């Protein structure tokens, strides 16, 4: 019994010593945490004598300024703390004392990645702050930029990828989190604009997918490949932009025309096909948004390209009943299409014209598809497809008015379809 008592006493002493050590460590961590937040560089230097600069801090639940969205006891590296809270003086002090900018947290983020994840939102249009709130917002932005400059000046790897399943680069993160102002800075500091993530998407793919014209313009200016295709799907930036712009949200917001034109003006191949054989025009026709379809036609999109399943752009257009209501656009597409293929490889007609209310239209289109065109009509279609909308008025100056009207007159077909509901 006596031996048990003595051993228990020694255990109590050891436990007490451990508690004292933990208490001292907790106090040290809390003081260093507060010094970093307050940018008290003298205190930081003093505390780093007893705390390795690349050792994480563990902040307990009673710390007043810890991140609300994180677990209160989650460890954080001092340099990550300074970067997340945009404390340039603390960041510089830590780097000067040997902090490693490439140290990663439990999610695989480096200091630069965390800076981009926590970049302050910027929706201000004023150039000079006039209120206290504007001044605070401007100071926050300036501190973020200064921290970014300090990191890059101290060798932060701008092409390091996040160590997780996405493998995003800094440029990918900048686009995801809307940090447009840093794109050019990263590119100027060596960021690879054509780097791909785990999904084989480049930064341009991501910018096009969200229809951010400023980001697209910046990336192209720094050499982004506008025709790079995602390996898994074959989608290009143009196809992604058309898909988003043709969606319900894109239609409601009237978004994307500027982005698509920007891509086309910078060499995007309008007739590029994905792995299923779809072009941007197939996507646009399925969406049925007239502005997007017209823009692609202006840049000589081919209305006769078939997918691997034998579907033409007009087949995609006729898939949705909402598209069929726009008879003028339908007529324009029909007048460019030859031969008219209404069914796919399985012989299935588009779902839209299979509805009972479109029976007469379906019968009319089937007759048109089976009726061979005259040589004159084929020639007119060829001229329309070669010159397109882009050079149509230039052609008007060269041809007799009657001939030009016969080539570009589509009202007869519109009239033919007018009787449908």
UniProtKB/Swiss-Prot annotation:
ANK repeats lie at residues 27-57, 74-103, 107-146, 166-195, 199-228, 233-272, 276-305, 309-342. SUPFAM superfamilies: Ankyrin repeat. Keywords: ANK repeat, DNA-binding, Repeat. PROSITE patterns: ANK_REP_REGION, ANK_REPEAT. GO terms for cellular component: nucleoplasm. Pfam families: Ank, Ank_2, Ank_4. GO terms for molecular function: DNA binding. The keyword Plastid does not apply. It comes from the Eukaryota. PANTHER family: ANKYRIN REPEAT DOMAIN-CONTAINING PROTEIN 61 (PTHR24197:SF48). This is Ankyrin repeat domain-containing protein 61. It comes from Mus musculus (Mouse).
